[in-house]
Amino acid sequence: MGLRAVMMFPIGVLVSLTAAGCGAGLKLTRIEAATNKPSNVAVFFAVDRDKEPVADLLASDFNIFEDDKLVSVDESRQTIVSPQLASAHYTLLLVDMSASVSASDQLHEISAAAIQFVGQVGKQQRVAVYAFDGSKNLYAISTFTPTEQQTAQGLNSIETFQSRDPSTNLNGAVVQALHELDKALGAADVPLRFGTLVVFTDGTDRANRVPLQEMVDAVEASPHAVYAIGVGNEIDDSTLSRVGKSGYIRVEDASASAAAFGEIGERIVRFTQRYYLLSYCSPARAGKHKVTIEAVKDGDKGRLEYAFDAQGFEPGCDPNKPPPFDTTGKTRKSRERMMATGEEAPAEKPKVEAKAKGKVSTEQ
């Protein structure tokens, strides 16, 4: 059965960010920037072209200008620092294990698809897998910080999972999964953090433990990207689109689930690879300056700008030094939303309190 992909909001919207300045085809969006003594300047940003992420750029693909004058590579010692020094990328896979799934003859295909997904995304991010049925609680299949052996054991347990409640607590599971993702990212020891939730389900909410609107509000209020994969005819596009605000795929049966997981996984990986942490040593020693970073790729160009104060700058710069990015909660929340949605952070809105009704069970 062929893969049927439906995007309520095209994936391009997710990765099309507003550039501070752009050339013919590249868009650069500044996520964070900072200076540090003795003369370090670091900028964390995303690169896109035609609403698609641009990966694998090298330090030599960027030109750095200060006050519109090119800074030589020998002088700047510009380098691409590992984004992991400043950012954390977490993905939570939420798998429907209600009776219609756990008691079906398609469980093997679903389990294999989940294992494939974790292997694919886990090379770039930390990945956790949680299951839900009709119960109030989520079930931790594999957490964000397990050993490799624990991960393998957890994923293998999907195939032998026994549903405690045959109903489907989809709404409650999504709200609680977002809470788990928030909690995990909150414990990360880096200033830049973003998460992704991927929901796999074969049906609509039947348990009615959490109202639909509460789930929708939680998804919309979350700074994280949320994808949905629906299998079968019970779940409709309307429900999938409200869960998968970043995009969704509906397939006819579980035999196509591997392709669906693969497509979502590829998008997540590419989305991660669009981020760059460019660091260099400024030749300035005093005064306020404008730095312009220009990316050049296959004839296309794009630019971003950042103003900084070089007061007290002096020799001795190491461009590989981790940048002192802001870690305050409010600033981080705006950055997370911008990174997850691909849009500039909106004006502050009243916070929607979506309480996680339930807890996580570690029993399989």
List PLM regions with ranges:
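C-terminal motif of bacterial Sec signal peptides marking the signal peptidase cleavage site
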Residues: A20-G21
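Acidic, polar low-complexity linker/tail segments
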Residues: L26-L92, M97-D105
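C-terminal "exit" segments of structured domains
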Residues: T35-S39, A254-E348, V352
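Second-shell loop/turn segments in exported
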Residues: D50, D96-L107, Q116, N137-S142, ...
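DG-centered beta-turn motif at the end of beta-strands
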Residues: F62, D96-S98, I110, V129-F132, ...
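…and closely analogous acidic/polar surface helices at protein-protein or active-site interfaces
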Residues: R77-Y90, A99-V127, S142-Q150, R209
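Von Willebrand factor
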Residues: N137-Y139, P146, Q150-G195, R206, ...
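VWA/integrin I-like adhesion module and closely mimicked acidic/polar interface patches used
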Residues: F200-K245, R250-V251, A260-I264
